[in-house]
Structure formats: structure tokens, C-alpha cells
From Swiss-Prot:
One of its GO terms (biological process) is phosphorelay signal transduction system. The keyword Acyltransferase does not apply. Signal peptide: none annotated. NCBIfam families: PRK09191.1. Residues 139-253 form the Response regulatory domain. This is Phyllosphere-induced regulator PhyR.
Length: 267
């Protein structure tokens, strides 16, 4: 398989990381586009190692950090929404946290990507975990038709200090629970539900009445990370690792709370 084919193979996961880092599909995809443009113009930046995925993320990180400070790409800046201002100052600990917990990179690979040593990666991940866990407990609605997965998710989020207001197996149940319970501060949603209904449709129904961050869970993430249509900013692949879910929940709540603080400040 050629290097170009390997890069294409890893793009869905780079998009996932970029969107989690910025909290936005538009912003994340803009940084990915800038990374691909760099690879086209400067193919030598990818290096000659056998770990193409780590090299791809390393190039992305270089672009991310340079644009965050200098904003030298007018095209990318014009594509970025207002909320990406927060993403542009996302600290190094959060990058280490997502690389390790969301993308599953080893400490060694995360160190190469971030240009730090392994001990620094460990310190950064620990720091991010403390930072993101602070003062973020919320009510969570789970939309999942597989009982065992629903039980795992419920135990996981409660272990993080959150409260599950209900578990829905269908679109109709999700709307009913949301209308009869305390408004959720976060939704975890499968995409394909038991009765053939869609978790996407269930979420869209709920978002008509209130705004809430949503994390989608699917066995086919590549179908929803093509960059060709409106897509989830937060996506977890099945089978999932508890650390992945924890990382994405923390990130989603972080961006939600930061957005509210900015709104209050600007009011």
C-alpha cells in the first residue's frame, strides 16, 4: 500500500481527533485540510518511518500549533467559526489526553507527535484528566438499543460522577424520557436503534427544543467521518474503550461550559 493510500486510510481518525480538539466539525476539518495541503506541497514533512499514522498526526500538530499562534493561513482562518477561538488556545495537556485516550497512541508515539518525552506525556495526560474532570458533573441521556452496551455506558458515566436520567432504546423513548425528566446536559447516542429508527433523528428531535452536546457511538465511524456532509463533532467507535468514552465526554462538556462562559461574558 502506498504512503498516499495509508494517509487516506487514517484520515477518518485524524478528523475525529481534530474535531474533538476544536469542538467543531468545520474547524477540525479546516485544520485537516491545511494538513493535507502541507503534505501535497511538502511531502517530505511526512518522514520515512513505517508509522504513517503517527507521522500524519505529527504534521497536523505542527500545523495546529503554528496556526494557533500565527494564524498565517487566511483560507483556514476564514473557514473557522467563532467558537474555534477557544480551540486555538487548547493547551498541550488536552492534546496529550486525546492522543492517548481517544486515539489510542502509545506514550512513545504521543511523545513523537507532540515533540516531548514519555515522562512529559504522562504528566500532561494526568494534568488534563484533573482539569477536565473538575466541576463537570451533569445529567446524561443514553440512547442505545443493546442492553449490555447501555449498562456499560451507564456504569461508566456514573463512575465519572454524572447522573443518568434514562436509557432509551428507540427514537420515541428518547423523546419521551427527555420530556419527562430533567433536561440532559449531555447525550450519548447510538446511530442505529432497535426498531429501525435512527439515533441521529432522535437527537435532531431533541435539539429542536434545547441545545446540548451530543456524542454519537457507532460501529461504522468511517461512514460519518468523510468530510462530505454535516457530521458529528464527537464520535466514538464500537467496540469502545472506557478511556475513550471518558476523554470524549470530558472534551464535549469542556467546550459546552466554555461556550456558556463566553456567552455570559459577552452578555
Amino acid at each position: 500500500m502506498s504512503t498516499a493510500q495509508l494517509v487516506v486510510q487514517h484520515l477518518p481518525y485524524l478528523r475525529r481527533y481534530a474535531r474533538a480538539l476544536t469542538g467543531s466539525q468545520v474547524a477540525g476539518d479546516a485544520y485537516v485540510a491545511a494538513t493535507l495541503e502541507t503534505l501535497v506541497n511538502e511531502p517530505e514533512t511526512l518522514g520515512r518511518s513505517t508509522n504513517v499514522k503517527a507521522d500524519l498526526f505529527r504534521v497536523f500538530t505542527r500545523i495546529w500549533n503554528s496556526l494557533s499562534v500565527n494564524g498565517h493561513s487566511d483560507q483556514v482562518q476564514h473557514d473557522l467559526p467563532a467558537e474555534v477561538r477557544l480551540g486555538q488556545i487548547t493547551p498541550l495537556p488536552r492534546q496529550a489526553f486525546l492522543l492517548s485516550c481517544l486515539e489510542g497512541f502509545s506514550e512513545e508515539d504521543a511523545g513523537v507527535i507532540l515533540d516531548v518525552d514519555v515522562s512529559k506525556v504522562r504528566d500532561l495526560v494526568d494534568e488534563a484528566g484533573r482539569e477536565l474532570a473538575a466541576d463537570m458533573a451533569t445529567e446524561i441521556l443514553i440512547i442505545e438499543d443493546e442492553p449490555l452496551i447501555a449498562m456499560d455506558l451507564e456504569a461508566l458515566v456514573e463512575g465519572l460522577g454524572h447522573n443518568v436520567i434514562g436509557v432509551a432504546r428507540t427514537r420515541t423513548e428518547a423523546v419521551k424520557i427527555a420530556s419527562e425528566s430533567k433536561r440532559p446536559g449531555l447525550i450519548l447516542a447510538d446511530i442505529q436503534l432497535a426498531d429501525g429508527s435512527s439515533g441521529l433523528d432522535a437527537v435532531n428531535d431533541l435539539l429542536k427544543t434545547f441545545e446540548v452536546p451530543v456524542i454519537f457511538i457507532t460501529a461504522y465511524p468511517e461512514r460519518f467521518l468523510t468530510g462530505e456532509r454535516p457530521e458529528p463533532a464527537f464520535l466514538i467507535a464500537k467496540p469502545f474503550q472506557p478511556a475513550n468514552v471518558s476523554a470524549v465526554i470530558s472534551q464535549a462538556l469542556f467546550f459546552q461550559q466554555s461556550a456558556r462562559r463566553r456567552e455570559a461574558h459577552n452578555a
